[in-house]
Amino acid sequence: MTDGAPRTFLNPTSAELVEIALQRGEGRLTANGALVALTGARTGRSPADRFIVKEPSSEADIEWGPVNKPFDAGAFDALWGRVEAYLSEKELFVSELEVGADDEHYLPVRVTTEYAWHQLFARNLFITPEHFNRGDKGVWQIINAPGFVCDPSRDGTHSDAVVILNFAERKVLLAGLKYAGEMKKSMFSVQNFLLPAKGVLPMHCSANVGQDGDTTLFFGLSGTGKTTLSADPKRFLIGDDEHGWAKGGVFNIEGGCYAKCIDLSQKNEPVIWDAIRFGTVLENVMLDENRVPNYKDSSLTENSRAAYPLEHIAQRKVENRGNEPHAVVFLTCDVSGVLPPVSILTKEQAAYHFLSGYTAKVGSTEMGSTSAIQSTFSTCFGAPFFPRPAGVYAELLIERIESFNSQVYLVNTGWTGGPHGVGKRFDIPTTRAIVDAIVSGSLKDAPTEHLATLNLAVPLAIEGVDSTLLNPINTWADKDMYAKYAKQLAQEFNSNFAKYQVSEAIKQAGPKA
């Protein structure tokens, strides 16, 4: 650069970024060595401010609506230019990274940030390659300018901040927001659009593998247990949130983890606890007077986070990929207290529950959500991140399950014995015992009983689990009230599913109101 021009740091190290972030006052060093940063008013994603540029190359393949909102191509170019001009006067951080741990399906990404801690986040969450863009692909660009204030009347945005994806130009623009999760979810959305065209199923799931190479997937919305359950001391982690399932195997889309921190404990989540050290970014975590993180403090948000590279986990799959999965787990957090802790699904039921995506928003990751826990249906267990119509992903899932003969399970990490506020939530040790039975294969052909209203098969016994918990009616003091709530939930499933054009076999696989 010319003399006097602001510096640009290319591929800076974690130590450099921590040092600069502290010098600039972007964050504080904690007692465990992590860097804690605050994101201001926006402590979660801002779905109302997320757009996709409407242009000929992708327009026909995107399901436009409240999730995927169109943005004018000319307005995007003008705004990109304004943000670039703003950043030209700033000290910048640039890294050459990749998204997708697969030689065929990776995307090269050049990430430019105004903040040092945002660059540390990107380097933790994306993949640092030995040789950047070895396949000479078109390079994606992310620019993240939290200090740029959007003007809706000038820029065509919804507010003072914006997230825009542009498939034709391979660009992601983030302006006016500090919440770092927008960066990772933007590139997830990009891969969710591109991978299906190559016959690869992109998934909002975690994945781990056993000593014998047996892979398990955990689908679920934020707060349902993806990160916690995949961080198993007895198994090797592939990744905690974003994966692709191609013919022959599963690969991580990322190079790090973005774990929820609320109520984190060393006893229940030792793998995550030990990963939080120097180089980790703690987002919106409160500290005590000795700089010790207080993970119980939700005064800023329920959505406090830790972003760390996979290298911080001792028991990980170094290749960042695994075999095709023998077991697939759909995690649901049922606030009604009606669903059993585990059900064994047929292929048709798997398609039904994948499309339904029934769960709860727990410590919601989205701005504008109340702190109250509420039930929701989120297609593919990740509706905010999937640009194509839901049927595209469901068809790919059925195809992959059938070709590899994977067994799918529905696991409730929510409530039993009554709805939220009356019943109690399944504890982590109980769910871990269920998952142990799933990954061992002992549940696949276990004797079951059929729950008529829910149309689900539940095992009669699981080692290490109180058998009275397995049929949820046993945990309710008032059996008539259980029947009422079960019927009500079945009706909610049916009315939500009415919008899908699917085979009669899949329609009949749902609850019977």
Swiss-Prot record:
Residue sites binding ATP per the record: K185, H204, G220, L221, S222, G223, T224, G225, K226, T227, T228, E269, R305, T431
Function: Involved in the gluconeogenesis. Catalyzes the conversion of oxaloacetate (OAA) to phosphoenolpyruvate (PEP) through direct phosphoryl transfer between the nucleoside triphosphate and OAA.
Family: Belongs to the phosphoenolpyruvate carboxykinase (ATP) family.
Binding-site residues for substrate, renumbered to this chain: R45, Y179, K185, R305
Broad enzyme group: lyase
Reactions mediated catalytically: oxaloacetate + ATP = phosphoenolpyruvate + ADP + CO2
Classification via Pfam families: PEPCK_ATP (PF01293)
Source taxonomy: Bacteria, Pseudomonadati, Pseudomonadota, Gammaproteobacteria, Alteromonadales
UniProt pathway annotation: Carbohydrate biosynthesis; gluconeogenesis
Gene Ontology molecular function: any one: metal ion binding
Bound cofactor: record note: Binds 1 Mn(2+) ion per subunit.
GO cellular component, as recorded: cytosol
SUPFAM superfamilies given in the database record: PEP carboxykinase N-terminal domain, PEP carboxykinase-like
Cofactor: Mn(2+)
One annotated GO biological process: gluconeogenesis
UniProt EC number: 4.1.1.49
InterPro entries from the UniProt entry: PEP_carboxykinase_ATP, PEP_carboxykinase_C, PEP_carboxykinase_N, PEPCK_ATP_CS
NCBIfam families: pckA, PRK09344.1-2, PRK09344.1-3, PRK09344.1-5
Ribonucleoprotein listed as a keyword: no
Ligand binding (Mn(2+)): K185, H204, D241
Entry keyword set: ATP-binding, Cytoplasm, Decarboxylase, Gluconeogenesis, Lyase, Manganese, Metal-binding, Nucleotide-binding
Subcellular location: Cytoplasm
Assembly, per entry: Monomer.
Record protein name field: Phosphoenolpyruvate carboxykinase (ATP)
